[in-house]
Regions:
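N-terminal intrinsically disordered/low-complexity leader segments
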Residues: 1-5
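Helix-turn-helix
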Residues: 6-9, 13-51, 55
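Solvent-exposed, amphipathic alpha-helical segments
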Residues: 9, 13-21, 67-71, 100, ...
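Hydrophobic alpha-helical connector segments
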Residues: 55, 66-99, 144
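Amphipathic alpha-helical packing segments from all-alpha helical-bundle domains
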Residues: 65, 92-98, 108-134, 138-142
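Acidic, metal/ion-handling microdomains and their immediate structural contexts
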Residues: 104-105
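Hydrophobic/aromatic-rich alpha-helical bundle segments in the mid-to-C-terminal region
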Residues: 111-115, 130-177
Length: 177
């Protein structure tokens, strides 16, 4: 008897395929092959591919944006929040972030989700910089965020890249008290 797959099993399988093979691998046939189940299980959980893709995007937005922000905001001051957010962001699955962004170049729905996520992340960073007393919080947030996105694209990541990026951002902050 086949093992039943949960909705989360399907999401996990899709994220793994997306990370390894790109969005073109997100087909019902490829997913059922990956999970070794019938298409009926897929349709039971999602109804169609569009609903499945929406579930993937929702999971990604929650795990890669809402959860790191939630974790950071458990801290009681802006400096600690910034440090906690930095740790949470460093621990993200960056190849998956790249795969979602590449998908967004080809799919308008994904692009809309990315625009929303980018806005949420920028607002979070702007708030952190404002709370730390920086005079140009929007500019600093934009610089920090675009450096984060760009740094993910350098392949392979040079040794010490995360540290170098952090040092550059710290230097910038010193000039914007």
């Amino acid at each position: 008897m086949a093992v039943r797959k949960s909705r989360q099993d399907w999401v996990d399988a899709g994220m793994e395929l997306l990370r390894r093979e790109g969005q073109q691998s997100l087909t019902i046939e490829r997913l059922t092959q990956q999970l070794q189940v019938t298409k009926g299980s897929f349709y039971h959980h999602f109804g169609n591919l569009a609903n499945y893709q929406q579930a993937l995007l929702q999971w990604w937005e929650d795990a890669f944006t809402h959860e790191p922000i939630r974790i950071a905001w458990q801290e009681d001051n802006a400096q600690k929040r910034a440090q906690r957010l930095g740790r949470a962001v460093r621990d993200l699955d960056h190849p998956l972030e790249i795969a979602v962004r590449a998908w967004g170049l080809r799919d308008p729905e994904v692009a809309r989700t990315l625009a929303s996520v980018d806005q949420q992340r920028l607002e979070c960073l702007t708030g952190l910089h404002r709370d730390q007393g920086h005079q140009q919080p929007e500019l600093l947030a934009y610089l920090e965020y675009t450096a984060f996105i760009g740094a993910q694209l350098v392949q392979p990541a040079p040794d010490g890249a995360a540290r170098a990026l952090q040092q550059a951002l710290d230097l910038w902050r010193e000039h914007d008290p």
